[in-house]
């Protein structure tokens, strides 16, 4: 009985140590009147928290990124009047 308790405790410790913050793929676009400083601030927040900018768009203001949920909430709140954030996924027509 003590042995199984020891194993369960070790498993709990290991699972907590290897917990990974899951990143979402998102597309973030901005209104044309968005100051470049707002976009740069959002990119910096994503990169500083371990996210990755996967593509920067040239025809419109925006970029795609892999970002964790906490950072995504922060970027969304700080840029709510400028940014549109949506999940990056495959879209098809019927």
Curated annotation (Swiss-Prot):
Q: Which residues form a coiled coil?
A: none
Signal peptide positions (record) = 1-19
Q: Which SUPFAM superfamilies match?
A: Protease propeptides/inhibitors (SSF54897)
Signal as a keyword? yes
Gene Ontology BP, a term: vacuole fusion, non-autophagic
MF GO annotations: endopeptidase inhibitor activity
Q: Which UniProt keywords apply?
A: Signal
Key word Signal present = yes
Instruction: Give the protein family.
Output: Belongs to the protease inhibitor I9 family.
User: PANTHER family from the xrefs?
Assistant: INHIBITOR I9 DOMAIN-CONTAINING PROTEIN, PROTEASE B INHIBITOR 2
Please identify the protein, giving its name as recorded: Uncharacterized protein B24G3.190
């Amino acid at each position: 009985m003590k042995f199984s308790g020891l194993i369960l405790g070790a498993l709990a410790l290991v699972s907590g140590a290897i917990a990974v913050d899951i990143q979402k793929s998102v597309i973030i676009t901005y209104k044309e009147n968005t100051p470049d400083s707002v976009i740069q601030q959002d990119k910096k927040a994503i990169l500083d928290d371990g996210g990755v900018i996967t593509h920067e768009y040239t025809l419109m203001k925006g970029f795609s990124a892999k970002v964790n949920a906490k950072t995504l909430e922060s970027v969304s709140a700080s840029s709510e009047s400028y940014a549109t954030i949506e999940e990056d996924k495959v879209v098809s027509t019927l």
